[in-house]
Amino acid sequence: MLRFNGSMETRLLIANPLLGHFEYTDYFQMPLLWNPKAKRVLVMGLGGGSTQRAFQHYFPTVHMDTVELDPAVAKVAKEWFGVKENKTHKIHISDGRGYLRRNKERKYDAIMMDAYSSNTYGSFIPYHLATKEFFQLAAEDLTVNGVLAYNVIGTYNEWRADIVGSMYRTMKTVFPHVYHFPAADSRNIVLVGVKAKTGGL
């Protein structure tokens, strides 16, 4: 189990690292429903690497870039949670928005957002990763049929519902289609933005 300032970030079963994680991380595989021939994905936020392990296991030929702000998190993920860098997975120590702004070399078929900061009051989305300008940067770095999946901690009607609604409305200013998928085992909702105008389900 990995905690930041008392907030649980990652959990897994040592006997089977593909089990025991939060359900919402499985939802990060949904972008491939829209883009089943995806070749390159970007994950913002590493934590204990639940998303990275799943992608490397189920989609071994997909190239994955992970952006993590804190080098200490990357060190712990490698040493204690079995996260590996190899020919299909590269970890970049960088701010997520800065990475998108500097990226001129590649387009991604999917971007998965799970980048949180934390303090004594809990976890929160960094403001600069939740603006219209950020989503425009992300859309520019997506392929024509690219998809953005964003983990938002909150619920529909009660706890942090205002954050969920605000994120949904902001994504809709950039992405023609936005869907929401609540996790059953936690207060997480994954918002999925589809870049293509014909990207409906």
PLM regions: where:
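A residue-level signal for beta-strand positions that form part of recognition/binding surfaces
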Residues: M1, T88, V190
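A broad, structure-centric signal for solvent-exposed, well-ordered loop/edge residues
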Residues: E9-R11, K107, G200
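The AdoMet/dcAdoMet-binding core of the Class I SAM-like
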Residues: L19-Y150, W159-M167, V174, S186
